[in-house]
Amino acid sequence: MGKRFIFILMACSLLSIATAVHAQHIDKQTYTFAIKKADTLKLDKYVMIDQIQGTQSKPVILFAFGGGFKGGRRDNPDYISYFHFLARAGYVVVSTDYRTQLKDIDKSEYSDLQGFSSALQQAITCAVEDFGDATNYIIEHS
């Protein structure tokens, strides 16, 4: 009798957890925040549905994907569960593009430290500019 009761109790608990998680639907919207020459820069906004109707301000997390300024994607599937976790915790998550200036780098051109250092600094400056534009877009549209 005791084992059966515990089993039923656990099954009910799991069912209620699954229902609660399912009820917390995350909405994703994609916006273009800048066009720079051939690059169209977009951002994805993740927010829990019940937070959309509210008028109370929510904290925003601006996420920068990794990739050493050579590659990466704002919508990499590996990040989505992290975005959903943060959205369920009450944050608005914004994952943004930025120009990856080192993606087409000719390694032979930058074989010396000074040449590579210059290219890296240019890539960082470009990414910072893009994050500034994304931040301005978020502020203007909040």
Where on the chain are the PLM-derived regions?
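Alpha/beta-hydrolase active-site loop
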Residues: 109-142
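Bacterial Sec-dependent N-terminal signal peptides
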Residues: 1-26
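N-terminal cap/lid segment of alpha/beta-hydrolase-fold proteins
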Residues: 23-56
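Short beta-strand element of the alpha/beta-hydrolase
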Residues: 56-67
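Short, solvent-exposed loop/turn and secondary-structure capping segments
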Residues: 55-57, 72-75, 105-107
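Alpha/beta-hydrolase active-site loop signature
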Residues: 68, 100-102
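Serine-hydrolase catalytic-loop signature spanning alpha/beta hydrolases and amidase-signature enzymes
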Residues: 68-71, 93, 137
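Short amphipathic alpha-helix adjacent to the substrate-entry channel of hydrolases
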Residues: 75-95
